[in-house]
A protein has these predicted regions:
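FAD-dinucleotide binding site
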Residues: 1-473
């Protein structure tokens, strides 16, 4: 049985971008209808309950300075923030040696260099800093609206980040630290990503240190009640009649005087058809490319989706009765070249109970460990925690993980990235409407691309595009 519905604008995807676009359209007096494949809203933002009314964020979670759009939206919805726990000494495990320090790795204070010297030489830290400064200078030359128009766009887009790092660093340790940072920000390896994409993304986020930093950086704060509160509240405001869950869009007919979206109906054998004046596709480019379009999309747009793979990440939470590491003067933050969780944060609730160690498996290690049994992954992650924080870390009360590449309607995280040649050959198609079809999603943002703030920007932009177009129509 096929249910038939009509709307002014059909929106594919109930993540932040799709819900913000719907909100903008509703404010303009239009009737949007959001179709979401999952049985929930939020997309790559997801809370998991851990008891006592508390949650951990198994998807996107942080907000930092300069992310004005998501900050304003959260404030309007009444969602407050609290600081990521950053007090105490951070741990770094490198080449089989361990050091503790306070501050950021890119800080050049003498006391930090001294503290780190057991694991990382002063020469390697200086090497890292000179390359980071050069990278930031290059990034500022990349136009955020048109990365392909950068002065050396083709040269930069024709090489991987790995190639650039090898040419611009002198120490193996600095190269390894750039690898760790690439995994942490893009959930990919330096060999996977175009240098131009790294530069665009760095400029988009306000500099390399801001991307990787906690205090003063992109990981500075979290949301009370978890980040998924924001899309949940947006969906509540939108109203159930404007949102359909369990409705993956399979085919979009577009052209003439409207669009027709064909989706599953939520029950076995059921189908849903939505007729609208225009459509916004607010899912990652990889997933947008899996929808069938009639007529087919222009070659440039279709091939773009073939050249924007998603990163790979497994997000783990080891949950303890209390954050015992704090009593030992540790922040809970750690970086390790051994892994498998190479980046660790204290992800405890704001009152510090229970204690939560968040461990990320990213890039190559996420691909390797994602193919292994869950029990084996858990054992390896906890062994790494114990190596860093002591044997007590090997015995959590509960262990939670999310393998985002296994999610049918996600297939990876944190977001899509550009491979070599992607920006200069296909980038013009990323945001450009195709007739009655418009594109949204964090990857299409020009500021804080790939982040929740970028998702909000993209939803506002796509909603405004369509509202203006329908005024003319």
């Amino acid at each position: 049985m096929t249910e038939q519905l009509e709307a002014d604008v059909a929106i594919v995807g109930a993540g932040l971008a799709g819900l913000v676009a719907a909100r903008r359209l509703a404010a303009a007096g239009l009737q949007p209808l959001v179709l979401e494949a999952r049985d929930r809203v939020g997309g790559r933002i997801l809370n998991e309950e851990i008891g006592g009314g508390k949650v951990v964020e198994v998807g996107g979670q942080w907000i930092g300075p300069g992310q004005a759009r998501i900050a304003a939206l959260a404030a309007e919805l009444g969602v407050d923030t609290f600081p990521t726990h950053d007090e105490g000494r951070h741990l770094i495990e490198f080449g089989g040696k361990r050091s503790s320090y306070e501050g950021a790795l890119t800080d050049t204070r003498i006391e930090l260099v001294r503290d780190l010297s057991r694991a990382i030489s002063p020469l390697a830290l200086a090497d890292l800093e000179q390359a980071r400064a050069r990278l930031d200078r290059m990034a500022r030359q990349v136009p955020l609206e048109e990365p392909w128009a950068a002065p050396k766009a083709r040269r930069w887009d024709g090489q991987t980040f790995e190639t650039w790092v090898r040419r611009n660093t002198r120490t193996a340790a600095a190269r390894s630290l750039f690898e760790l940072a690439t995994e942490g920000v893009w959930a990919a390896e330096p060999a996977d990503v175009s240098l131009l994409h790294i530069l665009f993304y760095t400029h988009s986020g306000g500099g390399f240190n801001r991307l990787v930093g906690t205090g003063g950086g992109a990981q500075q704060d979290r949301f009370h009640g978890g980040s998924q509160r924001i899309p949940l509240l947006l969906a509540e405001q939108l109203g159930g009649e404007r949102l359909r869950l369990g409705a993956p869009v399979r085919r979009i007919e577009h052209g003439g005087d409207g669009v027709v979206l064909h989706a599953d109906g939520g029950e076995p054998g059921a189908a849903l058809t939505v007729r609208a004046k225009r459509a916004i596709v607010a899912v990652p480019p990889t997933l947008a490319g899996r929808i069938s379009y009639d007529p087919p999309l222009p070659a440039l747009r279709d091939q773009l989706t073939q050249r924007m793979p998603q990163g790979t990440v497994i997000k783990t939470m080891a949950i303890y009765e209390e954050p015992f590491w704090r009593g030992e003067g540790l922040s809970g933050q750690a970086a390790s070249d051994a892994g498998p969780a190479r980046v660790v944060f204290d992800n405890s609730p704001p009152d510090g109970s229970p204690g939560v160690l968040l461990g990320f498996l990213e890039g190559r290690l996420a691909r390797e460990w994602g193919a292994r049994p869950a029990a084996e992954r858990r054992q390896a992650v906890l062994a790494g925690h114990a190596r860093l924080f002591g044997e007590r870390a090997a015995r959590p009360e509960r262990f939670v993980e999310r393998v985002w590449a296994d999610e049918e309607w996600t297939r990876g995280c944190y977001g899509c990235l550009m491979t070599t040649g992607g920006w200069t050959e296909y980038g013009r198609a990323l945001r450009a409407p195709v007739g009655l079809l418009h594109w949204a999603g964090a990857e299409t943002a020009t500021v804080w691309s790939g982040y929740m703030d970028g998702a909000v920007q993209s939803g506002e932009r796509a909603g405004e595009e369509v509202a203006r177009a329908l005024e003319v129509d």
